[in-house]
Amino acid sequence: MMKILVCLPLLTLYAGCVYGIATGNPVSRLVTETLSLITAHRTLLIGNGTLRISIPDPQNHPLCIEEIFQGIETLKNQTAEENVVEKIFQNLSSLKGYITAKEKQCGGERRRVEQFLDYLEEFLRTINIEWNTEWTVES
């Protein structure tokens, strides 16, 4: 069961990547690049592990955008500036324009950066898959 839970997000990411590449959707490519950068530089983003960032309750809608961007801003302010990390924040800033129209405010408790990154990755996968059709139509 645990292997399925670990493999499911990877399968979702792969499906999103394949769709994004096949459709040539620039937003999908940006999401895919950002997910890859977060995965590659997760340890750097986590730092010493003491920072706490609000994560919406999993029972709420998965796209609690305001909290996500507040968390991103908190993480950005607490992360040492390096070119590769700055690219993550540039990508996330670029994506903000596409997703604020779907904004939903949610409440949540403060958790470790690692848990926030898990939530952020799931958030990016969700917008990559669920909204891809809408972005393709609007382009």
UniProtKB/Swiss-Prot annotation:
**Gene Ontology MF terms in the entry:** cytokine activity; growth factor activity; interleukin-5 receptor binding
Q: Report the leader peptide range.
A: 1-19
Keywords for this protein: Cytokine, Disulfide bond, Glycoprotein, Growth factor, Secreted, Signal
Q: Which residues are glycosylated?
A: 48, 77, 91
Q: Which GO terms describe its biological process?
A: immune response
Q: Which domain of life is it from?
A: Eukaryota
Q: Where in the cell is it found?
A: Secreted
The family database entries (Pfam families) matched by this protein are listed as: IL5
Main location group:
secreted
Q: Which InterPro entries match?
A: 4_helix_cytokine-like_core, IL-5
Q: Name one GO cellular component term.
A: extracellular space
User: Which family does this protein fall into?
Assistant: Belongs to the IL-5 family.
State how it assembles: Homodimer; disulfide-linked. Interacts with IL5RA. Interacts with CSF2RB.
Q: What does this protein do?
A: Homodimeric cytokine expressed predominantly by T-lymphocytes and NK cells that plays an important role in the survival, differentiation, and chemotaxis of eosinophils. Also acts on activated and resting B-cells to induce immunoglobulin production, growth, and differentiation. Mechanistically, exerts its biological effects through a receptor composed of IL5RA subunit and the cytokine receptor common subunit beta/CSF2RB.
Name recorded for this polypeptide: Interleukin-5
Organism from which the protein derives: Notamacropus eugenii
Designated gene of the protein: IL5
